[in-house]
């Protein structure tokens, strides 16, 4: 009996010391599952509400005092700075092409690439979208893809914006590194700055005077689109190469008035026949253009 009493007392003292230590140092407590915690596992998971530098509070002069007149001024300016409608950005990768010759002028779409672009144009037409802006990379394969799509959707070719910021390139060194693709550091510096400038030009919440939801179509390239997706969703940009998207596929991102960003489609190409699904430059056919 004496042994049982001693054991019980020792166990109780140990448990008491354990819980006392937990109260003193709550940071050492571990949840049964990390998903039960309301705090991000990684600080980088916290959403930056002013990612586009258009958060209303960042645009309005701060309160100078607590007087009613000053508070009314601040609230009125804050309301005027708020976006009211969403922006939809639909990104389309160019169709299949052949990397033939030393000049971009010779990098035409293959016959299959033209068919891919035609299916994508029909799909965009079926969605019934009224386009506010169409932007295309200035590279040959993106220009040809854009021309084919324009035949299917209601948008005048003369209004298309041709943007060199969207040209293909090396946005940022990928993680994990890959052995088959290692651009020089100078290329990352040159291309990365340009592609980031393209992101900042087209990805931002709506202006306060925008009265309806807007739709922007961007015809570009695989590397650029994947980088844009990571940046827009505030994922580590170095992870862009882990994503794979097919030729002429559709990626749809929405920027809400609050600045939150969501993705509706990522590399959608299910509207094409299986024989048209490709994502790499063909090596076994001749350029038919």
Curated annotation (Swiss-Prot):
Transmembrane parts of this sequence: 7-23
UniProt entry keywords in alphabetical sequence: Hydrolase, Membrane, Mitochondrion, Mitochondrion outer membrane, Transmembrane, Transmembrane helix
UniProt enzyme class: hydrolase
A Pfam match: His_Phos_1
Catalytic activity: O-phospho-L-seryl-[protein] + H2O = L-seryl-[protein] + phosphate; O-phospho-L-threonyl-[protein] + H2O = L-threonyl-[protein] + phosphate
Gene Ontology cellular component list: mitochondrial outer membrane
GO terms (BP aspect): positive regulation of mitochondrial fission; positive regulation of mitochondrial fusion; protein dephosphorylation; response to anesthetic; response to heat
Single GO term (MF): protein serine/threonine phosphatase activity
Membrane-protein topology: Single-pass membrane protein
Subcellular location: Mitochondrion outer membrane
EC number: 3.1.3.16
Superkingdom of origin organism: Eukaryota
Family to which the UniProt record says this protein belongs: Belongs to the phosphoglycerate mutase family. BPG-dependent PGAM subfamily.
Quaternary data: Interacts with Pk92B/ASK1.
Function field: Displays phosphatase activity for serine/threonine residues, and dephosphorylates and activates Pk92B kinase. Has apparently no phosphoglycerate mutase activity.
The protein's name in its UniProt record: Serine/threonine-protein phosphatase Pgam5, mitochondrial
């Amino acid at each position: 009996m004496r042994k049982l009493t001693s054991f019980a007392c020792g166990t109780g003292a140990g448990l008491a010391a354990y819980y006392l230590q937990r109260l003193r140092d709550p940071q050492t407590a571990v949840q049964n599952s990390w998903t039960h915690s309301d705090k991000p596992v990684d600080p980088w998971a916290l959403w930056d509400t002013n990612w586009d530098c258009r958060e209303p509070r960042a645009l309005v002069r701060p309160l100078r005092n607590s007087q009613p007149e000053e508070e009314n001024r601040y609230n009125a300016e804050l309301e005027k700075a708020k976006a009211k409608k969403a922006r939809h950005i639909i990104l389309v990768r160019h169709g299949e092409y052949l990397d033939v010759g030393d000049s971009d002028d010779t990098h035409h779409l293959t016959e299959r690439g033209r068919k891919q672009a035609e299916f994508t144009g029909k799909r965009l037409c079926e969605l019934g979208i009224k386009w506010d802006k169409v932007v295309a990379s200035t590279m040959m394969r993106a220009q040809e893809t854009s021309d084919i799509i324009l035949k299917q959707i209601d948008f005048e070719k003369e209004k298309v914006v041709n943007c060199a910021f969207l040209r293909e390139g090396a946005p940022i060194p990928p993680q994990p590194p890959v052995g088959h693709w290692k651009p020089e550091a100078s290329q990352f510096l040159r291309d990365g700055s340009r592609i980031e400038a393209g992101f900042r030009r087209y990805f931002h919440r709506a202006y306060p005077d925008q009265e309806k939801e807007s739709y922007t179509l961007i015809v570009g390239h695989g590397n650029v689109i994947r980088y844009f997706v990571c940046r827009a969703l505030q994922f580590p940009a170095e992870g862009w190469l882990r994503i794979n998207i097919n030729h002429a596929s559709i990626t749809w991102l929405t920027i809400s008035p609050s600045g939150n960003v969501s993705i509706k489609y990522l590399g959608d190409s299910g509207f094409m026949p299986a024989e048209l699904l490709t994502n790499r430059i063909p090596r076994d056919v001749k350029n038919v253009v």
